[in-house]
Amino acid sequence: MLPIRDENPTLRPPVVTYGIIAANLAAWVLVQGMGAEPALSHSVCSLGLIPGELMGRIPAGTSVPVGPGVTCRVDQPGHPLALLTSMFMHGSWFHVLGNMWFLHVFGNNVEDVMGRFRFLAFYLLGGLAAAAAQVLAAPDSAIPMVGASGAIGAVMGSYVVLYPRAGVQTFVFLGIWARMMVLPAFLMLGYWFLLQLLSGALAPSEGGGVAFWAHVGGFLGGIVLTPLFLNRRLLAEHKAATGLA
């Protein structure tokens, strides 16, 4: 399933959502060289999160291959700042554009009822919850973790809490069969969450390069954090104007 747009208007410009998208794209272009080597591998090595390094499970000085002819040299102790910087690093054009598209579709409505500063704090804490989940699931992993997926998972978890009945125009495809459908948010995002949960349970802890448990942790973190960051006045305004929430 690929969400195209939701049928859920906003009352205010999503300044923070657009700012986060701009920051991720700027990091991809200016820091990661748009995926060109050696900038990509060096950025993943220096700014990505290596669970085993953070947890002290990998011996200092260990070399971890991350790209063609590029290795990460593990330091001890691992730098906690990687929990934050890893949210703004990506592995490919598909990775960064896919993540930013999901944030574009769902982030504006969550920001609309939290307010800008609360939403920014929520997004970052959701990303930290996602990183913590992946580290706990694979504490010995030497594979660098990068991407905004966990933080965006938190946004999607919040969206389900706030707008379960909102329609989401979704491109649904199965083999050669494809169709555009309007699905309720709880169904579209519930399917996404179930897919991450099953993939995390059935795949190795390192997920073949996909941090499934970060997605799960982010989604659940978003559900838990939403009541703490929700602005009741903004929610009431949104509900009065749209009939949703």
Q: What residue spans do the PLM features occupy?
A:
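A detector for small-residue-rich transmembrane helices and their helix-helix packing motifs
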Residues: M1-A245
